[in-house]
Design a protein with these regions (language model features):
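A short helix->loop->beta-strand "cap" motif at the edges of active sites that frequently abuts
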Residues: 85-90, 133
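Short acidic/His/Gly/Ser-rich catalytic and metal-binding motifs that mark active-site loops
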Residues: 62-63, 99-104, 143-146
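Histidine-centered active-site loop/cap adjacent to the catalytic His
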Residues: 147-183
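Alpha/beta-hydrolase-fold catalytic nucleophile elbow
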Residues: 56, 93-94
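Short beta-alpha junction loops
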Residues: 87, 94-99
């Protein structure tokens, strides 16, 4: 049995991804923020139905001029609810750690980014729990120790680990669909 999967998000989303017995669509935009969800190619996800959708957004919304995390939280909650309308299962990829250099394009200090990231993730964990949306964790020290030279994007090892996490969830959902279809 094959399942339809979508992976939606910013440049951390793999450009290509294959899992046996799965039809995977990638909706990826480099530098994507929450407000890009209503623009192509991200909004194109709403034109189809899926068995499983991963959402990997939020990290690029944490900027030096972000004085309140509420708009990011509200935006992510809204996107997750819209994705629930088109998919049987939704997974939120927790906002990852980053190590910004002094001259980064967002102007955000590491301490501020980490504070805001934690606040957003903690709020979304509670929301996702109530909405039956599971979290894919990329916030561990292991992932932050395997960042590329820019301090933002995952290095090869972390990209492999992320793909393995996605593969595990996809295989679990496919097995559950098979079991649900045979009962």
């Amino acid at each position: 049995m094959s399942i339809k999967v979508a992976i939606l998000g910013h440049s951390q989303v793999p450009q290509t991804f294959h899992v046996q017995n799965s039809e995977i669509s990638i909706f990826r935009r480099s530098g994507a923020c929450i407000h890009h969800f209503d623009e192509s190619p991200l909004r194109d996800i709403l034109e189809d139905r899926f068995d499983l959708v991963f959402l990997f957004l939020g990290g690029n919304d944490i900027r030096a001029d972000l004085y309140d995390c509420k708009p990011v939280i509200v935006g992510l909650k809204g996107i997750l609810l819209r994705l629930k309308e088109i998919s049987k299962e939704v997974r939120f990829v927790a906002i990852e750690r980053r190590h910004y250099s002094v001259n980064n394009r967002f102007g955000v200090e590491n301490a501020q980014y980490e504070h805001d990231r934690r606040q957003i993730n903690n709020n979304l964990r509670k929301f996702c729990g109530r909405q039956n949306i599971r979290i894919v964790n990329t916030t561990t020290r292991w992932f932050s120790d395997h960042l590329g030279k820019d301090g933002v994007h995952f290095a090869t090892e972390a990209q492999r680990e992320l793909k393995q996490k996605f593969t595990n969830v996809i295989n679990l959902c496919r097995e559950q669909a098979i079991q649900g279809g045979s009962s």
